[in-house]
């Protein structure tokens, strides 16, 4: 069996999870394989030789990216040169489309096979990117069925592989066991999840804590749990919590345990909303961006929804409160009835979970190996 050399680039924590799962499946299906590129700790643990820390790519928002643009462009140029010299059997860009799509285009021009894993939101905005994808990408692997339909219509080779989180998370999570593990009492419990990036927590952290205080005034028995994505986010949240009298437990990571344990979630729009959906926890989605970023996006977005649960349901399944509509009072009022209710949401969540549960990492690995004839 000849040794395969596979290059992968992931740009943030969610991509690191998907990349590690794909690498594990590739090693089972083709044990003689080595991995190069850029990834986080999970991908490195599976054997990736990472050229630089993945955190250097984790930037969100049009305005925010501008401040780091020179560094990002320089890193991408160097990465393209390195990968063309290394000549991997296949390159897999995992999400991070503004960084990886250009790499795919250049590598494909150099006759290197290219795969993009996780569709960018081309169906929602900047639809002309599909032309670049068609030119630069031998195969698109999508997590969601509505994305695969979009690419089929546009003539892009595509495979819907499902989502590895839907495989990993049980159809019915044990709330009592999760609470026992975390040492949490019975009674109403709300998870607060203001995001994993510093900018997100800066815009949403205090707002979510204000909403928690309003909710506590409406429902004196309610308690809160807040997972911190990193030590840096914990410091940031501890500063925001100072001088607030809230029955709140901070966790280091453990977002899945927090979701399993809670009754409802106040959550930033992003990948975590999919996790909340898979745990069948009723949610209210909120988001704030830099005002200029929001103004630009509002004029570009084609989709009526921003959150994954609504995009997957193709209807308004969960409330979305954005920008100026995301006030502490509005969030508390919208969340309160979901603590004991939310059955319509959870029914929809169960249906979506079953659709996405397809053994994603193995499906993706088979598709990659099929592309390169292995």
From Swiss-Prot:
Record-level GO cellular component terms: membrane
One family name in Pfam for this protein: LpxB
UniProt EC number: 2.4.1.182
Gene Ontology terms describing biological process: lipid A biosynthetic process
Swiss-Prot/TrEMBL keywords: Glycosyltransferase, Lipid A biosynthesis, Lipid biosynthesis, Lipid metabolism, Transferase
Entries under InterPro entries matching the protein: Glyco_trans_19
Catalysed conversion reaction: a lipid X + a UDP-2-N,3-O-bis[(3R)-3-hydroxyacyl]-alpha-D-glucosamine = a lipid A disaccharide + UDP + H(+)
Residues spanning the membrane: none
Signal peptide positions (record): none
SUPFAM superfamilies: UDP-Glycosyltransferase/glycogen phosphorylase
Glycosyltransferase among keywords: yes
Name used for this protein in its record: Lipid-A-disaccharide synthase
Species annotation: Pseudomonas fluorescens (strain ATCC BAA-477 / NRRL B-23932 / Pf-5)
Lineage of source species: Bacteria, Pseudomonadati, Pseudomonadota, Gammaproteobacteria, Pseudomonadales
